[in-house]
């Protein structure tokens, strides 16, 4: 699995992951503010939304 591992889409850093999912974490009430991207699917947090997906580079 190949996932993006950066906070903004301008820096197209990718990593190869053993996990079969990628994630994108962002602030729930502030559209467009991405906190993190990476491998796996972390647990939900208060005031954070996490989008998990199952294909290469799906967390853009």
Swiss-Prot record:
One of its GO terms (molecular function) is toxin activity. Pfam families: Toxin_cobra-type. Disulfide bonds join 3-22, 17-39, 41-52, 53-58. Expressed by the venom gland. InterPro entries: Snake_3FTx, Snake_toxin-like_sf, Snake_toxin_con_site, Toxin_cobra-type. One of its GO terms (cellular component) is extracellular region. Coiled coil: none annotated. This is Toxin S5C4. It comes from Dendroaspis jamesoni kaimosae.
């Amino acid at each position: 699995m190949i996932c993006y591992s950066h906070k903004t889409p301008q820096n197209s850093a990718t990593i190869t992951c053993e996990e079969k999912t990628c994630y994108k974490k962002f602030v729930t009430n502030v559209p467009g503010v991405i906190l993190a991207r990476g491998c796996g699917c972390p647990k939900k947090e208060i005031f954070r939304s996490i989008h998990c997906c199952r294909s290469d580079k799906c967390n853009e």
